[in-house]
Amino acid sequence: KIISREERCLNYLQDTVKTVYKVLRKTEKYMAIQYDYINEILPHDIFFITTKELEDLYPDSTPKEREYYITKEKGAVCLMQIGDLLASGVKHDGRAPDYDDWTLNADILVYYPVLDIALELSSMGIRVDKEALLSQLDKAGCPERANLPFQKAIIDETLPFTIGGGIGQSRICMFFLRKAHIG
């Protein structure tokens, strides 16, 4: 989706997450009406936290363990700012340097009691602008990518600012049907 320069901010990302989460809750409500064995488990609101804040909460845990602990506690979590190094010197998770802005991206995670896991339902982000792209290419050790056609178009500011992401269709089906696997 094309956005304005002013919309390249945390508030816009969080508003987008809230919109997606509202649809997830409506879908769960519908499924609970249709199927007797399905109960609503998603909390009313999604909990927002950065990877830095999460590492500060659980400094002795792995990134996946941190996701599990916070998601089990909160029910639904928007984990933001994925891709850069944390205070520990490691990344929470890898992200391409020329895709999402690492300061403006997020995963939607829900606690899934059927498998006792943190289940990622969506990954999204405001895409890199010139400054974020150059910084992230440098941090990733691949500044030469700045000469590739797509990356050059971002640097030359000939492409619009955008936000995008994906929904894990199989995971969504598995979650809403309360199944251990789909397929």
PLM region spans:
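Alpha-helical scaffold segments that mediate packing/assembly in large oligomeric complexes
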Residues: L24-S61
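Class II aminoacyl-tRNA synthetase-like tRNA-binding/catalytic domains
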Residues: K1-S4
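A translation/RNA-centric and nucleic-acid-associated enzymatic feature enriched
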Residues: K52-G183
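A conserved active-site cap/scaffold subdomain adjacent to cofactor or substrate pockets
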Residues: C9-E28
